[in-house]
Amino acid sequence: MQKNVVSNLFVDLPKHADQEWFTSLLEKPHCRIERIVSYGQSSPDGFWYDQAQDEWVLLMSGEAELDVDGESVKRLPGDHLMIKAGTKHRVVRTSADVPTVWLAVHC
């Protein structure tokens, strides 16, 4: 039997990384929960996520702007968004001066 795990999503954040950091918190056959940490990153020009699973994201710190099917969506801490499977989306910008911390659930 596995033990319960207690942790904090704001502990051990990478320091001003030049790339986004993805930390898997839970993986099951049809569900994945991850912490994403960004410092000013954005999706490469012309790149779009188009995922087979729904994705729910919660912005916990920093600010972000997404493009979801051609619509600009600005996010502040506490904002969350459900992105349905097959919806093209990309990250336009994230805060560069503070960590932008996301919690993402893929199901």
What are these regions (language model features)?
Residues 63-65, 72, 88:
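Structural motif
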